[in-house]
Amino acid sequence: LNKQIKIGFSKIGGIYVGELENSKLHKHRAITIALSFNDKFEFEGENQKITTSGLISQPNTNRKYNYNPNTLIAFVHIEPFFSLGSTLLNKDKEFEELVTEQTKEIAEILMQWCNTNDNSEKLTETVIENIIKQIATETPQRFIDERIKKSIDLIWNSEQIDLSELASINNISIYRFSHLFKQETGISFKEYVLHKKLIKSLQAIVTDKETLTTSAYMGGFSDQPHFNRTYLNAFGVPPGKSIK
């Protein structure tokens, strides 16, 4: 079990394909597409449990996955405020099952990606965009407040930037900016920065082949235990059991 096939990263999201142990209840900050290549799995949301071959979960919602042994599973985590990600946002549904045709098309895209030696960020981004198009063909894009969109770009492109700096850049009070940020993203500024640290650490592990400890520091965590807790809260499994 816990056989990792391939992991990819890009600015707009990441992909994991492999075998995993059942997850604990967790809450991820990204939009998540989960699908199985060879067997159905059990998904548990806030108030509902289903058995499915594929589904999409909204950001900041609780979810739990249970699989049969040797189930080959894929997770596509999509940043909701970059590129086409916003076309998948749906405030009315915590999750939605994929139709059979969507699951097949996405599985085919992912298998082609798995079978190539290219693991560049550019290819991962192209794969994610192609997957999004399988689901969001006619969905109108949800527009985010331009000040928050600009602030999110600054958060990702800056080593360190705090709430007061972003409030000042946007010419509003810290209180107003903090409220606006949560209103637009669904989470606090502090929670979003923690999400960014997690993704930066994962990139160091997968792309730079760094150790968990070194990657935790590279992402901005004060120590590895903090990284481990954040990872478990986001993915429902410990890092040592899902990334190598």
Q: Language model features by range: what are they?
A:
Residues 144-188, 210-218:
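DNA-binding recognition helix and immediately preceding turn/loop
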Residues 2-5, 20-23, 222-235, 239-243:
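Helix-turn-helix/homeodomain-like alpha-helical modules used for DNA recognition
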Residues 87-153:
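Amphipathic alpha-helical segments enriched in hydrophobic/aromatic residues interleaved with Lys/Arg
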Residues 2-93:
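N-terminal regulatory/effector-sensing and dimerization cores
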